[in-house]
Structure formats: C-alpha cells, structure tokens
C-alpha cells in the first residue's frame, strides 16, 4: 500500500472516531495567542471558535473597535455569563488619527485587573488595535522597544503600520492599577 493511501485511511479512521465520540474540532480565533497568564488576544471570534473559547473559562471579553459587536457573539457572551466590555477605539492612521491615550489607559487598567481574568482582548483581526494595546502592556512590563516591535510585526505580517509603532513608543499616559488586583507578573507601582 502506498504511503498516501495509508494517510488517507488513517485520516478517515480518526475522523470516524471523532464522530463516534461526538467530538468537535477545536478552532481558535484568528491571531489567537496568550499575552500573559490569564490574558489572551485574538481577532473577532466566529461561531466555530466558541467551543475553543469555552475551554478558556473566560470571565471577561474586551472588544476594541469602532464598530458594533456581531449578534451571534453577543448571544455567546450572554449564554455563557461572560462580562463584556466594548471600547470604541479608532485606529492609528497617518497623518491625523490616533488612539486616545486616556482611553488606552482605561482599557489597560481593565485588562490588567485580575478580577477580570481570564480575559480575551480582541479587535476585528487581532492586529492593529490589539497589537498597539499589547505593545503598551509590554512597555509596562519593561520590554525593549525592539522586542515589542518584533512581537507586533509577527502578528501584523505585511500590514505593519508605522503609526501603531509610533503610538506604542510615545504612550506615557498613567495607568491606574489597584495593587490588590495587579497581576503577579507585572512589576510596577
């Protein structure tokens, strides 16, 4: 028997076993990754990714985008008693549009509050807005700017926006984090 035929037979076998055991394929949302223990990032979750999200036992979902949430996602959030926060955040675009520094500080305070963990932070594609916010978290963690930009570029691929990187670099707005609910991996006062 040829190796291609063997692989096809194995695939058929495992698919039939999964059906027999009533298992679903687990599909993470676009650009999903862990930022830090209890904090995840992604693009907009679709219904196929909901079983994956259930495994995370999310307490909070934060959506950062200037548009509305999809009804199927709102239903998922309500049906699973997940705390939902929607911040209408504009994208960083040259030459005059920039994320609001005060709003970013407010979002970071929510993301870093352990009472909200486990938490998913997402925008539509999980690239620009979330990438900028993650870059600001990395600054708070004391990462080097080159490491921050490297992480940003891993998620943005060819869609790098210099304005996002500039925003991360100049962000200095104070972020209030209650010391009682600060994550143990964040070493700031």
Regions found by a protein language model. Give the residues of each.
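Cys-dependent protein tyrosine phosphatase-like superfamily
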Residues: 1-121, 125, 132-189
């Amino acid at each position: 028997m040829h190796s291609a035929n063997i692989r096809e037979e194995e695939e058929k076998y495992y698919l039939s076993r999964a059906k027999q055991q009533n298992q679903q394929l687990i599909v993470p949302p676009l650009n999903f990754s862990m930022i830090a223990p209890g904090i995840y990032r992604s693009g907009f979750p679709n219904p196929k990714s909901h079983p994956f999200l259930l495994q995370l036992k999310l307490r909070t979902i934060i959506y950062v985008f200037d548009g509305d949430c999809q009804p199927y996602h709102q239903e998922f959030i309500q049906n699973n008693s997940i705390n939902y926060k929607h911040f209408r955040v504009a994208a960083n675009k040259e030459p005059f549009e920039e994320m609001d520094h005060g709003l970013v500080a407010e979002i970071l305070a929510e993301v870093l509050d352990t009472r909200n963990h486990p938490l998913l932070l997402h925008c539509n594609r999980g690239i620009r807005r979330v990438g900028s916010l993650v870059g600001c978290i990395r600054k708070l963690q004391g990462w080097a700017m080159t490491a921050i930009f490297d992480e940003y570029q891993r998620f943005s691929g060819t869609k790098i926006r210099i304005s996002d990187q500039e925003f991360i670099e100049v962000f200095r707005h104070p972020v209030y984090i209650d010391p009682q609910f600060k994550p143990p991996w964040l070493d700031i006062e």
